[in-house]
Amino acid sequence: MRYSKNFDVIVVGGGHAGTEAALASARMGCDTLLITHSIENLGAMSCNPSIGGIGKGHLVKEIDAMGGAMAAATDEAGIQFRILNSSKGPAVRATRAQGDRVLYKAAIRRRLENQPNLSLFQAAVDDLPVKGDEVQGVVTQMGLEFMAKKVVLTAGTFLDGKIHVGLNNYAGGRAGDPAAVSLSARLKELKLPQGRLKTGTPPRIDGLTIDFSVMLEQPGDLDPVPVFSYLGRPEQHPKQVPCWISHTNEKTHDIIRGGLDRSPMYTGVIKGVGPRYCPSIEDKIHRFASRNSHQIFLEPEGLTTNEFYPNGISTSLPFDVQWDLVRSIRGMESAVIVRPGYAIEYDFFDPRQLRHSLETKVIGGLYFAGQINGTTGYEEAAAQGMLAGINAGLAAKGKEPWLPKRSESYIGVLVDDLIARGVQEPYRMFTSRAEYRLSLREDNADMRLTAIGRDLGLVDDYRWGVFCRKQEAVSRETSRLQNIWVGPKSEAAPFVSQLLDQDLSHESSLAELLRRPGVTYESIIALGDGMWAPETLDEDLGLAAQISDQVEISVKYQGYIERQATEIARQEHNETLLLPESLDYSQVIGLSKEVQQKLNLHKPETLGQAGRISGVTPAALSLLLVHLKKDLGHTQEAHE
């Protein structure tokens, strides 16, 4: 049976990638359908009840800058907020929030149900009908056909998912949910290159059985209280609660070692590779054998539950070993497990077979986003989902895709890393992955992306108005600081000397003073009882804080940022030089067989992408550039 209505875009999966994809497509005016096996689990935080962190928080800010839901939902559901790396430079400062699972799901579902142009349908998808090389829609488990111009697949860990607890295993997408076995088989029929990855989760603990009095309390930040969304306010936050810190010990490690003979990871039952930066406790004990202790964060799952998430002891050991290892930890001697930890193996598809739009090269109109592409983490999934939803929507309208650059966003870094390099293990974002991270900060994601989002139809009038007000205020205040001068003999000189802890030797603008070590924007405007304070930055105190932060960072780091902008411009030429899809690299004289094979395998779209493939040297790029100019006369056409 065929459904009575056709859609512009169908999104399969209601996790973090799927919800952002569906919302983005619908905001752009596309008639969008989100199909999920469980409407109750839309936006569920399947593992750690937190959003953000180093690199990840940057992605959330970028999603928010373009009108996405994750940051705003976190402001409504976050029960603890912290700024990580607050004492370090602005490039690596990152927001992290502990979330209430129930409140977060409710916030996401409310946005989905109230989004114009978006329909929801509960069903499992088993098939993707393809005509020629173009996807036509989806077919559900009960045989119902939904037709669409474009399809976004965000299947998470559900594709042929297998859950492991000790040597016992069973099919599942996550605890309590079925695996997508038929859909996985269908994708393999389409000859898409596939592999297996693994992730895991710790046992959940009844908080009433934990002795917090012997643990270290970890409160959130209070002055100021962070927010995630550029439109967020601390007043939106629910009740704030602490996390708690404990540690494993030698007894814990002995218990784990004693159970390794029944570990699916260490007996060869699990074949998939797990995330390097979120290892299981078994891996930690094995890889860091000399350490006698590992930190554990006891994180509350929400305000209406007693469950705690012991971050740091993800495990797939048998339940009896989990029970003993938990009870060996200080403060958890009487702890009761309410949900066992487990590992899950699942199919992923090589992201090198994707275009930068996240459309598959093999099947036109089919887009992949999230863990299906080999990533790990809610934030990485949400960023891909938004991008896939945007590009599916643009394609449905007959428009060119939006391809974010590495130099303009962490989303661009993420996608380029996946497509140029592929994955050998679950990929997670770090600030260290971005070569232009001083320009890609949390505080300026809106300055980088909101105008783009507006042009794409993603940003509503209210967000646009607030952004324009902020942008104008930052420009006005920066100019004011550049045009107020103070000399050694001026009335203000004593105040400046006191601030600098030395005499002012020459005339300086306030902007120049702000660039000095230890000088802040707040200290400048407080001089002489506020003689240089602006009349007002904005009536909205939250926006005023954003403005002052933006002014201080842009002024203080102006020289570094300008040098980075020059470097970006220099790289742009080769970065955007298009490579013909039909180019046979074995015909490029001078390239080694290895490089020829890698280029023919990956089929990079631009010279910049080619340069990020492992083993492709600058010398190889020079030979390729000569070939393009000499044999193809391609240089001019590449930029048209």
UniProtKB/Swiss-Prot annotation:
UniProt main location, coarse: cytoplasm
PROSITE patterns: GIDA_1 (PS01280), GIDA_2 (PS01281)
Residues the record lists as binding NAD(+): 274-288
GO cellular component, one term: cytosol
Subcellular location(s) of the protein: Cytoplasm
Keywords: Cytoplasm, FAD, Flavoprotein, NAD, tRNA processing
Source taxon at top rank: Bacteria
Cofactor: FAD
GO biological process: tRNA methylation; tRNA wobble uridine modification
SUPFAM superfamilies xref list: FAD/NAD(P)-binding domain
Binding site residues for FAD: G13, G14, G15, H16, A17, G18
Molecular-function annotations in GO: flavin adenine dinucleotide binding
Family the UniProt entry places it in: Belongs to the MnmG family.
Purpose of the protein: NAD-binding protein involved in the addition of a carboxymethylaminomethyl (cmnm) group at the wobble position (U34) of certain tRNAs, forming tRNA-cmnm(5)s(2)U34.
Quaternary organization: Homodimer. Heterotetramer of two MnmE and two MnmG subunits.
HAMAP family registered for this protein in UniProt: MnmG_GidA (MF_00129)
PANTHER family membership: GLUCOSE INHIBITED DIVISION PROTEIN A (PTHR11806), PROTEIN MTO1 HOMOLOG, MITOCHONDRIAL (PTHR11806:SF0)
Name of this protein: tRNA uridine 5-carboxymethylaminomethyl modification enzyme MnmG
Organism: Polynucleobacter necessarius subsp. necessarius (strain STIR1)
Taxonomic lineage: Bacteria, Pseudomonadati, Pseudomonadota, Betaproteobacteria, Burkholderiales
